[in-house]
Amino acid sequence: MFDYKKFENDLVAAMEATLHKWAEEYDDIYLLSLDCARDMTSVGMMANTEQHLNEESDAEDDDYWFYKYCEEEWELFEAGGLAKEISSYMRQYAEENDARFTDPETFEFTEEFDEHCDQMIDACERAIRRLRQSVHQDFPKLLLSFHIREYLDDEERAEFFASVNSKEASEEYAAHIEDFN
C-alpha cells in the first residue's frame, strides 16, 4: 500500500530543504514548482530567478511569458537528495504494481492507476499548500506551482496556481498560460 501521507510529508520536507539551499545562493528566486512525472515515478523541484529571466528575455519580448513560467526553461532543478529518495519510493511502488496499473494488451494506464494518480496529485497539492504556509514569512513573494507534463490542462494549472498565489499573480498567469504551456 502506498503511504500517501508519508509521501506528502516527505515532499514538504524536500521542497523546504531545496528552497532554503537555493536561497543561500540566489536571492531573487521568484517561482518554485513541484514537477511530477506523468507515470508517477519521480518528482523534482524547479525554480527560476529574476536574473535568469532577465538574461533570457525582457517584459517587452514576445517570449517573455514563456521564459517566466515555462518550467523547462528555468535555471534551477533538483532531483537529488530527498527528491531522489521520494522518487525511488514512487518508482518501486509503480514497478511492484505494474500489472495492476497498465493494461498488457493496450499498454494504457488502468482505472486503478488513475485512482492512484488522483491520490498522488492530491498529496502533491496538499504538500504545496503546506509549503506556502511554512515558508510564507521568509519568502512572502515567492510564487508556487505544480507541473505534470502532458497531464494537467491549462484550466487545472491556473486554478491550482490561483489557490496558492496572490490574485494579481494568478491573473497574470492565467492570462498568459497559452504562451508557456
Regions found by a protein language model. Give the residues of each.
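Alpha-helix initiation/capping motif
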Residues: 45-53, 70, 165-170
